[in-house]
């Protein structure tokens, strides 16, 4: 079924341009999806170049079979482990660029069987990798009301989190929810004030999805791994799609660009300062999609691209 879902890659050229591709370089596409970024990277690599892709979605792994290129390989797993994948291949410090396209992809959103969207009814799943972990339905059925409320507030910034959590628990007590439509209806009924521009279940679905997939923890680990394995001058290009992701990426790049903070006037020798380490990254700025891209692909509206370069020698 997956071939029925068209995926338009957001900030395609900008994200790949941010990598400053060298024809003989080694690159990582940490979120293969349907291969938009990977194909563009491969088109800019020479015969000696290499591209390692990663994705935890089995459908993405299946889609990658269409790329018959000796310079390309793909790993089925979370991008949080990219540091491990690189070390296993003895490539640490040799990676010239890493691209991460965060969040859920259009094929995942548009396929009702994946359970990511309330727009069409489907199983209440939401897992990036349906072969691992608890589904959204299982977690909501077993979680405490206070924990559900915390997730909705923290990862969905939902102001009616407590009311919605109570309604979810009460509904599951009567008859456990198994469908996306059921969750959307429960949330809508529990929301006293409706936003005329946004479905009342939008924030709840985002929060549950982030929690079920440990998305923010995955991003943090991936960013740390990227800094560890990038070569000096290597680029990190990251696309985020909502404020929680972008704040995390922005904070990480800012902190890694600062280096250790030493109080002014603290007596330290040059050798002691060197032991503390210098800054790991140099932030190169951010880009947002233009009006033409947003008009063609409305899902690009909230996207932000941030690029940084590995420092040191």
UniProtKB/Swiss-Prot annotation:
Compartment(s) of residence: Cytoplasm
EC annotation from Swiss-Prot or TrEMBL: 2.1.1.199
Top-level taxon in the UniProt lineage: Bacteria
Catalysed reactions, as listed in the record: cytidine(1402) in 16S rRNA + S-adenosyl-L-methionine = N(4)-methylcytidine(1402) in 16S rRNA + S-adenosyl-L-homocysteine + H(+)
Chain residues that bind S-adenosyl-L-methionine: 35-37, 55, 79, 101, 108
Main location: cytoplasm
GO molecular function, one term: rRNA (cytosine-N4-)-methyltransferase activity
Pfam family name, one: Methyltransf_5
InterPro entries from the UniProt entry: RsmH, SAM-dep_MeTrfase_MraW_recog, SAM-dependent_MTases_sf
GO annotation, cellular component aspect: cytoplasm
Parts forming coiled coils: none
Single biological process term from Gene Ontology: rRNA base methylation
Alphabetical keyword list: Cytoplasm, Methyltransferase, rRNA processing, S-adenosyl-L-methionine, Transferase
Signal peptide start and end residues: none
UniProt keyword Transferase present: yes
UniProt keyword Transferase present: yes
Family, similarity comment: Belongs to the methyltransferase superfamily. RsmH family.
Summary of the function given for this chain in its UniProt record: Specifically methylates the N4 position of cytidine in position 1402 (C1402) of 16S rRNA.
Protein name (database record): Ribosomal RNA small subunit methyltransferase H
Organism the protein comes from: Cronobacter sakazakii (strain ATCC BAA-894) (Enterobacter sakazakii)
């Amino acid at each position: 079924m997956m071939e029925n879902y068209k995926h338009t890659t957001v900030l395609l050229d900008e994200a790949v341009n941010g990598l400053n591709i060298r024809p003989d370089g080694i690159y990582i596409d940490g979120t293969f999806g349907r291969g938009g970024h990977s194909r563009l990277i491969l088109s800019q690599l020479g015969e000696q170049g290499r591209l390692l892709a990663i994705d935890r979605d089995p459908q993405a792994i299946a889609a990658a079979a269409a790329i018959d290129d000796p310079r390309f390989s793909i790993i089925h797993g979370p991008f949080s482990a990219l540091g491990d994948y690189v070390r296993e291949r003895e490539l640490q410090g040799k990676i010239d660029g890493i691209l991460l396209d965060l969040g859920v992809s259009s094929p995942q959103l548009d396929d009702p069987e994946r359970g990511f969207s309330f727009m069409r009814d489907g199983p209440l799943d939401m897992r990036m990798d349906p072969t691992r972990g608890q589904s959204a339905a299982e977690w909501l059925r077993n979680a405490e009301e206070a924990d559900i409320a915390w997730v909705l507030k923290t990862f969905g910034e939902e102001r009616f989190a407590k009311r919605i959590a109570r309604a979810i628990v009460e509904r599951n007590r009567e008859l456990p929810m198994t469908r996306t439509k059921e969750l959307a209806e429960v949330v809508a009924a529990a929301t006293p004030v409706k936003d005329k521009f946004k479905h009342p279940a939008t924030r709840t679905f985002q929060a549950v999805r982030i929690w079920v997939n440990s998305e923010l923890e995955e991003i943090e680990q991936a960013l740390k791994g990227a800094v560890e394995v990038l070569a000096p001058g290597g680029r990190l290009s990251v696309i985020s799609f909502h404020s929680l992701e972008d704040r995390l990426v922005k904070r990480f790049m800012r902190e890694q660009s600062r280096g250790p903070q030493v109080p002014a006037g603290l007596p330290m020798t040059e050798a002691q300062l060197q032991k503390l380490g210098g800054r790991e990254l140099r932030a190169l700025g951010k880009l947002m999609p233009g009006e033409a891209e947003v008009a063609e692909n409305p899902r690009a509206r909230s996207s932000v691209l941030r690029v940084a370069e590995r420092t040191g020698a």
